[in-house]
Structures are given as structure tokens and as C-alpha cells.
Amino acid sequence: MKGILGRKVGMTQLFTNEGILIPVTIVEVKPNVVTKVLTVEKDGYSATQLATEDKKASQIRRPEINKFKQANTTPKRFVKEIRNMTGYSLGDTIDASLFQAGEIVDVTAISKGKGFAGTIKRWNQHIGPKSHGGGGGSQPLRQTGSIGDISGNRVWKGMTMPGHLGSEQVTIQNLEIVKEDPANNMLVIKGSIPGAKGALVVIKKAIKTSHKKEAVQLLNLKEALAKNELFEQAKKYNVELNMQMSIKEMQTLLDEAIKKAEEQKQPEGENK
């Protein structure tokens, strides 16, 4: 098992070399520090405790200072344990290079809070009949239905009732890493993930899927625009180019065609 802590930045879309649009989520992954290593012998289970993002000086408590000193780091804001993550020592640093493009991961975060909601929105219950006497009395339109047997003398725990919707820990499984960018502390994940913008997320290796997909070949927009400009220039000189060529190869063929065109113009000027 392996995992890392990050922060959701937002969603955007990318294009593959085949022109397919992919919705993706950008996750900022600042370097994580190993602040504790838990073992079966000492703690009863194996895990690695990770921490990220420095705390403000005004929020630091004295006990925390000594704890983080042992890991040779400053007090951190977010601390989480990754179960069964082994092979790391106290003070080690983990960055976005932990995951590679094509890997399948599970992402956990606190979902968006949507405030107080009724049973129809919160639990997807049916709306009551809108005609034939419905909408009130014994056939309410949006009211909660039965919440238990009359002989129970109490409401059993777990009944689907109105209440606070959202703000719960949610995990979405089997999401694909589209791109990793350790230089910019960034991971690009295919699809949407839980949480609002700026939410703390935990990215772990998928527990149900062990295989790795072939990395998606993303379109390089700058390169594509440069090639389009070369294609437009090539039309003037009847030069055949294709998208499989590199920019250097295309530029070389175009330069040769321009040079030949100039050489053909020079004798014509001398004859005149």
C-alpha cells in the first residue's frame, strides 16, 4: 500500500493525441513528511503517518513541537495515517513522483456540505401523488413516510429522515492518474473527486484493482499550435508534412523548400 496527502485545486479538461476530451481534477501535492512509523509489534498494526502543510506559529502547541522535531521537520497542519504503508523511515519525504501516469487510485475526502435537506433530496425517496387527493392529509407530497412500527415506542437508529446533507467522508475508487508533475507538486486525476475546492484529500493505491493502465498520451497544445503554423507555411511551398513528424523535421523540410524557391527566383532576376 502507498498513499499521499494533497489538496483539491479544481477541475479542468485535457485532450489526448487522438482528440478525445478528458475531464480531470488537479490535486496539489506538497511534499509529505513521515512523522511516525507504526508497527504490528509496538502498535498492533502497521501504518505510516504522513504530514503536510506548515502550521501558523500562533496555532502551534508545545507538545507538537517535540513530536515534529523527532522527524526533523516543522509542525504540520494535516496529519493522517496510511494503513499497511511500509518501507519508510522517520523524517522521509514523499512527493508526487510516488504515483505514475496510468496507476489506479482511491481518493478520500470530506464531501461538500449542502445544509439541511429533506428525505427526497437526502435519501432519494419518491414524491407523493400530485393528483387524486394527493398533496396533503394521508398522501403528503414531500413529507417523510413511516419511520417505524407503532409498537416499538421509539424511532430506531438509521431511519431515513431529514437532516444535514453532505460533509461526510467519501471515497471514490478506481480513478486513473493521468499525469504526475513533481516539479510543480501536482497530480492530475481522471474524473471528479469528493470535496470542495481546497479540500484535503487522501490518495491511496486502489484496494480493488492491482493492474496499471497504459498512460494516456496527452496533447501538447504548444507543440500542436507550432505544427499548425508550419503546415500553413508548407502549403505555400507544396511541402508534404504529417503530424507524426517532429517540429525539427518539419522545419528542416520547410527550410529546404524555401531555399529551393529562392534559388529558382535568382536566375529569373538575372535574365531580366
From Swiss-Prot:
InterPro entries in the cross-refs: Ribosomal_uL3, Ribosomal_uL3_bac/org-type, Ribosomal_uL3_CS, Transl_B-barrel_sf
Keywords, comma-separated and alphabetical: Ribonucleoprotein, Ribosomal protein, RNA-binding, rRNA-binding
GO-annotated molecular function: rRNA binding; structural constituent of ribosome
Entry keyword annotation includes Protease: no
GO CC terms of this entry: cytosolic large ribosomal subunit
Domain of life per record: Bacteria
GO biological process: translation
Start and end residues of each stretch annotated as Disordered: 125-146
Role: One of the primary rRNA binding proteins, it binds directly near the 3'-end of the 23S rRNA, where it nucleates assembly of the 50S subunit.
NCBIfam families the record matches: L3_bact
Family per similarity comment: Belongs to the universal ribosomal protein uL3 family.
HAMAP family, A to Z: Ribosomal_uL3_B (MF_01325_B)
Subunit-level organization: Part of the 50S ribosomal subunit. Forms a cluster with proteins L14 and L19.
Protein name: Large ribosomal subunit protein uL3
Source organism per UniProt: Metamycoplasma arthritidis (strain 158L3-1) (Mycoplasma arthritidis)
Biological classification of the source: Bacteria, Bacillati, Mycoplasmatota, Mycoplasmoidales, Metamycoplasmataceae
Gene symbol of the encoding locus: rplC
